[in-house]
Amino acid sequence: VTSEILSQLSSEGSHVIIDHEKEGKIKQPSHIRIVAEFSNILNCDLPNRKRIAITLGSNIAPIDDVRSITNHSTGTTGWSISEYLYRMGHDVFCIAGRTQYYPNFNLPKVKYTEHPIEMLEEAVNISSSFTPEVWIFSAAVLDYVPKPSEGKIPSTKEEIQIKMDPTQKHIPVILNATGQCYSIGFKLESNIDLEKLLEKASSQISRYSLDAVIANRLEDLNNPESPRAWILDSTGKSSEISDLTSLCGIIESLIAN
């Protein structure tokens, strides 16, 4: 009976939110998901809602059958941006690598892929199938990957040498596959002063013709007394971002204008 009622409501144009089956029953979705989906429905008719693709999390590549190399990223920033943009009515597609956290509600369009080559292939596919109007590159992509050894490298060896090869840069390939779009990059550095950080962000904008770059330092991420990040646009204007909530709001304002 419930299925028939839900089907009838859907056919009449109602938006029905159904949770996954748990313990043999379909229970009420969490309040967080209900609010998120309602916000998306309410805001999707606002002007300048966009199709947005975002990469997030870290890459991982094998050293041997049991060991691997990865970049530092929990995925917190990428998930937070994705959730915020979805609630604001945008159509969001996430390409997620390895993350320590998951979104607070089920985002409708998520692909998980951890290896840098596979992530790039997925992003290129999405460039044609989803045709993003905006790309946000927040993933910590491996710049180098090892040539994996067959089996397990013996732990009795006193030292090992690992040969690493450079990976293909994701941003130019993805933007070339997408065509005209608004693009935001991320630049994470460590033990560097602000002037040098902004110089590196500016170089990234010039190299890839990005519209803006979010620059931050590893040592600032968990320091409540430090800014969360700085944003630099293609005109050279920079500004401080106090926290993650502000970061999400600033990105949305750039996209929606």
Model-assigned labels for residue ranges:
Residues 14, 90-91, 179:
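Short phosphate-binding/catalytic loops that engage adenosine nucleotides
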Residues 15-50, 218-257:
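Glycine-rich phosphate/pyrophosphate-binding loop and the adjoining helix
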Residues 70-84, 153-173, 207-211, 240-254:
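Gly/Ser/Thr-rich active-site loops/lids in small-molecule metabolic enzymes
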Residues 35-52, 84, 116-135:
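Short amphipathic alpha-helices and their capping/turn segments at secondary-structure boundaries
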Residues 1-23, 27-38, 182-212:
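Short, glycine-/small-residue-rich phosphate/pyrophosphate-handling segment
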Residues 114-187, 194-217:
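Glycine-rich phosphate-binding loop
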Residues 20-23, 97-100, 140-141, 188-189, ...:
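Short, ordered loop/turn segments at secondary-structure junctions
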Residues 7, 49-115:
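Glycine-rich phosphate/diphosphate-binding loop of Rossmann-like nucleotide-binding domains
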